């Protein structure tokens, strides 16, 4: 579960693992894109922990993608 206070790379790893477990192809790419959508920046460049709103948005996007909703529909 993605929570407020998580560091960006830890959040992306968590999302990637969940997507992989759900059978989503390209889970690493999808996790990075979902982070970018939720946080508004690239996880590789971000260094501040996730805020509450960012974490909630990333969690919601992850749940939708894990349910196999196409990434393009989430953008």
Identify the meaning behind each predicted range:
Residues 1-26:
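Non-catalytic nucleic-acid substrate-recognition regions in nucleic-acid-modifying enzymes
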Residues 28, 33-75:
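Conserved AdoMet
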